[in-house]
Design a protein with these regions (language model features):
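Alpha-helical transmembrane signal-anchor/signal-peptide segments
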Residues: 1-17
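Soluble non-transmembrane domains of integral membrane proteins
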Residues: 28-170
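Short, solvent-exposed beta-strand/turn "edge" segments of beta-rich domains on protein surfaces
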Residues: 14-25, 43-46
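N-terminal start-of-chain detector that recognizes signal peptides
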Residues: 2, 26-28
């Protein structure tokens, strides 16, 4: 690390200097792209470095609660209680693993129809430097995208509803 610190060459991102080829360089600037990234499932596109879709499904969740109770004769027994509630979750909850006795009528779909996903511009640059895929993976500053006035009204056989700056399918 110390060796690298002494060998680093500060450069201006807007100027390419071939005398720095093969050297450890340092620059800063704004990452930009001319690409349009698209979420094909929802027909949403934006000129952005990345477009992140966050999806959640309303589904049953099981909560297991155990407590010890004294029994006549001086022993103890474990009493298990199961509670069920509906929650919004980005991850699929497998209701097949629920306690069968207490979960009657509480089953979740086999999968989330549209999972969370991330769409990335093909070419991202800072000045004259194109960022590597390993650097692009580290970009994690997101802001809400203002949805276009027109959004799909149906996806498959389901109606799409606008909810604030999001979509609800149901």
């Amino acid at each position: 690390l110390e060796e690298g610190k002494g060998a680093v060459v500060p450069v201006v991102a807007d100027a390419l200097d071939t005398s720095n080829d093969g050297k450890l360089i340092h620059f800063s600037g704004e990452a930009t792209t001319q690409d349009v990234v698209t979420d094909l499932d929802f027909a949403i596109e934006a000129r952005a470095l990345k477009l992140r879709r966050i999806t959640k499904m309303y589904q049953w969740e099981e909560e297991k609660e155990e407590r010890k109770e004294k029994v006549s004769g001086g022993g103890e027994k474990t009493v298990t209680r199961y509670k069920y509630s509906k929650v919004w979750s980005e991850l699929h909850i497998d209701s097949g693993s629920f306690n069968r006795k207490g979960s009657r009528g509480r089953s979740n779909p086999a999968s989330i129809p549209y999972e969370s996903d991330e769409f990335v511009a093909d070419k991202i640059t800072v000045g004259t430097f194109q960022l590597s895929s390993s650097l692009i993976k580290k970009i994690d500053a997101f802001e809400a995208l203002r949805l276009p006035a027109e959004v799909r009204e149906e996806i498959g056989d389901r109606t799409v509803h606008r909810t604030g700056n999001g979509l609800y399918i149901g």
